[in-house]
Amino acid sequence: MSNNIRLLVGLANPGAEYAKTRHNAGAWVVQELARVHNVSLREESKYFGVTGRITTNGQDLRLLIPTTYMNLSGKSVAALANFFQIKPEEILIAHDELDLPPGVAKFKKGGGHGGHNGLRDTISKMGNNKEFYRLRVGIGHPGDKNKVANFVLGKAPVKEQECIDAAVDEAVRCMDILLKDGLNKAQNRLHSFKAE
């Protein structure tokens, strides 16, 4: 059972100062998928982001990295989804995940925002529909909820970054499985992966 995913979104903050911060892990997925498919992402002001398009397994997949700030991501997602008549359940959103360690990434369908401002705004702008797919890229947790804001806007130490990068690479490899064979097979493969 394949999934008709038509849009992959990588949540991020715009600008060079945020490019390597943990909160931008979702964007790294989109950038890596574009690189693997030799596609350039270009600025599209009407979608408030950078976009591209790839074809994989005979399916067109639009790529989007919002260039709004994280807490306004939904404006970008909704603009592109509405223009191309893409339903929430045809969207996969890649985002950083505090509740998973670096080196781990997991696919999920539906659910709440878990305190993630990018997901919160996207759910709100999609009419409170939470049925989109998610790719949760583990970044770890600082251990104290009061330190989360600085943690996500900070850069990971080299070893942690290598683990995050390895999980992003594996997630990109699993995208083909997700699109061709469905969520369960993609989860089975990705969820058994852990970079050390």
Curated annotation (Swiss-Prot):
Molecular functions per Gene Ontology: peptidyl-tRNA hydrolase activity; tRNA binding
Catalytic residues identified in the record: H23
Residues flagged as site, Discriminates between blocked and unblocked aminoacyl-tRNA: N13
EC number: 3.1.1.29
Keywords, comma-separated and alphabetical: Cytoplasm, Hydrolase, RNA-binding, tRNA-binding
Superkingdom: Bacteria
Gene3D superfamilies found in the cross-reference section: Peptidyl-tRNA hydrolase
Pfam families tied to this protein: Pept_tRNA_hydro (PF01195)
Residues reported to bind tRNA: Y18, Y69, N71, N117
One example of a Gene Ontology biological process annotation: rescue of stalled ribosome
One annotated Gene Ontology cellular component of this protein: cytoplasm
Reaction(s) catalysed (UniProt annotation): an N-acyl-L-alpha-aminoacyl-tRNA + H2O = an N-acyl-L-amino acid + a tRNA + H(+)
Location, primary (coarse class): cytoplasm
Subcellular location: Cytoplasm
Annotated site (Stabilizes the basic form of H active site to accept a proton): D96
Family: Belongs to the PTH family.
Purpose of the protein: Hydrolyzes ribosome-free peptidyl-tRNAs (with 1 or more amino acids incorporated), which drop off the ribosome during protein synthesis, or as a result of ribosome stalling.
Stored HAMAP family: Pept_tRNA_hydro_bact
Subunit structure: Monomer.
Protein name: Peptidyl-tRNA hydrolase
Lineage: Bacteria, Pseudomonadati, Pseudomonadota, Gammaproteobacteria, Vibrionales
